[in-house]
Amino acid sequence: MSLNGVAAKSCTCLAVQADGAEITTVEGLAKGGELHPLQEAFWNKHGLQCGFCTPGMILASHELLRTNPDPSEDEIRHALEGNMCRCTGYQNIVRAVKEAAATMKGGAQ
């Protein structure tokens, strides 16, 4: 989840910490029925499989791209290192973040 615009682990956030805060979940990224570029890229690049890690991966990526719109592969991997995925091997997730960054800058990759 995003807590006041900063990525946070919902599993370790107490309700009292979230009281009065602006909270965004992965579902809140989509606007007007259209997927956010990160959601679209995860779909296009097969960055999701079982879906367990997907919300955390997408929200951590969203935070990264908010602060660094053109991250290197190493920067992406560093930003995602707290999120564990047992299905994809991470390469497609990194590709998805790169594609989303390009899309969000107005280009294509």
Summary of predicted features, one role per range:
Residues 1-109:
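Signature of N-terminal electron-transfer/Fe-S-associated modules in redox systems
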